């Protein structure tokens, strides 16, 4: 009986897959959807999003000519956001133009200190309802506007230029079930690890210039090819006129087909490193990107950088990280005139700090008068995590994702569960 049922299931899946040919889309296609997603760090997201894709006559499908995305959500742990994106490959002939506008208000923002393991973590002080402690919490608000222009040099190689304006506001949290009298944010100010003029945030103007290369067959769900970007950010401090700096940003992604269209090995390598000037503390956790597909590009850790690590647990002036995963397409079918793929993706992530932030001050002020420890001896190392995810694609470009990850270092990591509407890379 078991053999018979197995044969029926296999035959059914084979029939579904065999008949599940995706028809090219033309013109405008839009997919409004409720945002009922989850992230261990921010809680349950309740909101909505909608993607608008324009495919023209369908010749390049599933690649698009225009993409517009709007989204907004409120999270049960106290944050909310609004995000809009416009991305066009044909609005300006021979060029790609991208712009985005994001506002994010995190009333329970994680702040675990500078330089990763050099900042000790005491779990009993982190959102402890019994003692009313929320030591690793502050209130962070970010408004970010970005515009990027790319134009071919030769073949698949492009030059790019862009500008970004970012306003960050930081304050003590205000939560009725927790006391804000003692927090790491306040302790850092007391010893001037966070300086008075930068404590409440500020406004930055960022210019970027560099190169990109793209040989992917499908931009959002590649079967093969590679993508890389390398550029320099020059950042001017508009608020305090003293925190000007430059950083190098590099991203490399490679997609290796093991069974074409069915099984892909994909990996991503990233580097973000300050090499000149002085950065204000409130910009440490900004992860630079050319195209801000979603609202949350902050903090090394959590669902969009290193899965299995606490959001914002690694904050420094330089980072390197990598993501490695297998993407196995286990089922294809057509339903209600739409094409669906089901994908399983086991993954392995790693991260390291390449440049510490104010290490001498951090070490010097490592012990407060009351004995609270702000710094500890630690050996710089590569931090690793692993987990598994699942994806559902509808018509290739509409993606629902669920991933579970666990880091190998208990000082930095936790079991993280995240839902999203895209691949990590």
What are these regions (language model features)?
Residues 30-32, 46-48, 80-84, 141-147, ...:
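Hydrophobic, lipid-facing positions within transmembrane beta-strands of outer-membrane proteins
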Residues 37, 53-55, 87-91, 150-154, ...:
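Structural signature of outer-membrane beta-barrel channels/translocons
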